[in-house]
């Protein structure tokens, strides 16, 4: 598969905003969409410039952009289990944490056969809670992830139920 340039993806995104009124753009995966106009070979500088261009695009067109960035190779810990990645495990990780408004982890646990979604960063606390997590199970018949209900959750009233 050929690599796409960030400039061409953002130009197509701008076109889709005007023609179709899109409100969300997904870049997946990050490492296949290269910033061909990058001025630095330094990974941290490259990452910061990349994220700055996306932030400018989002503000200009009032679009939410999701960037799917896979971590570097993860290793098993001393307990034999795969470590849970953080934003720092993405190449240029410090910049990902510093420059992003939000960060979500989607981590598959093969032993428990579920997937965890965890909030790693929320810039504005009224939009979420750092460390909040939810678990999902893949349902192959429907092709959907089904939320797992934890016993503690069943006992607590949700804010709109109180």
Give the residues covered by each predicted segment.
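Walker B catalytic acidic pair
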Residues: 29
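Residues immediately C-terminal
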Residues: 32-35
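C-terminal regions of RecA-like/P-loop NTPase motor modules
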Residues: 3-25, 38-39, 53-61, 73-162
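Conserved H-loop
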Residues: 63, 68-70
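Well-ordered, non-membrane alpha-helical segments in soluble/globular domains
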Residues: 46-52
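Alpha-helix N-cap and loop-to-helix initiation/capping positions
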Residues: 39-46
């Amino acid at each position: 598969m050929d690599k796409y340039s960030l400039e061409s993806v953002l130009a197509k995104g701008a076109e889709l905003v005007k023609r179709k009124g899109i409100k969300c753009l997904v870049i997946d995966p990050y490492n296949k969409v290269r910033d061909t106009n990058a001025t630095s070979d330094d990974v941290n500088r490259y990452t910061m410039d990349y994220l700055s261009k996306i932030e400018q695009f989002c503000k200009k067109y009032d679009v939410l952009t999701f960037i799917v960035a896979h971590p570097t190779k993860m290793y098993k810990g001393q307990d034999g289990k795969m470590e849970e990645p953080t934003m720092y495990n993405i190449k240029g990780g410090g910049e990902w944490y510093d420059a992003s408004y939000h960060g979500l982890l989607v981590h598959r646990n093969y032993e428990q056969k579920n997937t965890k979604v965890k909030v790693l960063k929320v810039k504005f606390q009224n939009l979420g809670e750092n460390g909040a997590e939810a678990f999902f199970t893949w349902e192959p018949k429907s092709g959907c992830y089904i939320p797992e209900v934890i016993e503690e959750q069943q006992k607590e009233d949700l804010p709109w139920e109180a």
